Amino acid sequence: MLRGTYLFGYAFFFTVGIIHISTGSLTPFLLEAFNKTTDDISVIIFFQFTGFLSGVLIAPLMIKKYSHFRTLTLALTIMLVALSIFFLTKDWYYIIVMAFLLGYGAGTLETTVGSFVIANFESNAEKMSKLEVLFGLGALSFPLLINSFIDINNWFLPYYCIFTFLFVLFVGWLIFLSKNREYAKNANQQVTFPDGGAFQYFIGDRKKSKQLGFFVFFAFLYAGIETNFANFLPSIMINQDNEQISLISVSFFWVGIIIGRILIGFVSRRLDFSKYLLFSCSCLIVLLIAFSYISNPILQLSGTFLIGLSIAGIFPIALTLASIIIQKYVDEVTSLFIASASFGGAIISFLIGWSLNQDTILLTMGIFTTMAVILVGISVKIRRTKTEDPISLENKASKTQ
């Protein structure tokens, strides 16, 4: 049952990757079909990530009350219902509602699968890294599908494809649960919930609360860069008069992330995590500045790939480092880290959407670069952080692998 659920986790994370990039990949078609601006696209992205944040925050409560299995079933059901209604209406405002519901389902799937892996597998870091690769493959495959088969006359077909995939996955999941009915019925895996002890711990320890604040802000800014760069990349390319590569550029970005995460999985045991964050964020600054002044399509695609490669390991490494440095209440720290990332993706989308309407790509890239500079500053602060435990961060990290 455990192994089977984990294998379904691959499909669930693949789905999350698709939902994560769906709006951004369809941006050129949505702009033309509904005669909208990038500000309007920002609204969809905001509601999508608000839904994702809601799923991240509510999923632990659902798991506690109904178990991991029922929570996953509910998430799939909500997503299928949302997509079913889309068959009946292509209204702009319903697309916003659907984005929220799909985001909620994706947030619930990611949080629930992650909680299940952490609760049931000793090698949870390795298991999670494999799931993250499937997330990247999902985010990669969707823009490839759109670039190959979709035009302005059938822009809605990708949502039909998502529905078909989810329906097959849902049926397979129900069959799997029916064959393991007793185990699923008696399952009582629960996550650890924040309590007064966690609150008092951070309030009473100024150093720990400061460290937590650094990591939460880091997650906010990082997700603001990654998610919005990916979602607005087609619009960025169009603004630079490279519409012919606007869709395929998203795939180059996610190929870079996938390769980067695979490489990080191989070398993570030997990494100095704080040095890695500082190095990656510094590389990101250089690449973003260079990207701002590149107009050649080949060089732009290469730059997009390198940006994806440079940031591939930042999120999982920062999350792992946060749990190592702060030491206690790891579940609470993890939930807060992911929630802050979701919030960053939602809020910063408005800023990026506004900047793209100013008809100068330098403003948009300047915003991304400024956030990357702040990430470097936070990385320096993290680098200087010393734990009370004499065991080195690197030795502790090796024990978490």
Swiss-Prot record:
It comes from the Bacteria. It is a multi-pass membrane protein. GO terms for cellular component: membrane; plasma membrane. InterPro entries: MFS, MFS_dom, MFS_trans_sf, MFS_Transporter. Keywords: Cell membrane, Membrane, Sugar transport, Transmembrane, Transmembrane helix, Transport. Can transport glucose, mannose, 2-deoxyglucose and methyl alpha-glucoside, but not galactose. The chain crosses the membrane at residues 11-31, 43-63, 78-98, 99-119, 132-152, 156-176, 212-232, 247-267, 278-298, 306-326, 336-356, 360-380. The keyword Membrane applies. Its main location: membrane. This is Glucose/mannose transporter GlcP. PROSITE patterns: MFS. Belongs to the major facilitator superfamily. GO terms for molecular function: transmembrane transporter activity. Pfam families: MFS_1. Induction: Induced by glucose. Induction depends upon the integrity of the glucose-specific PTS system.
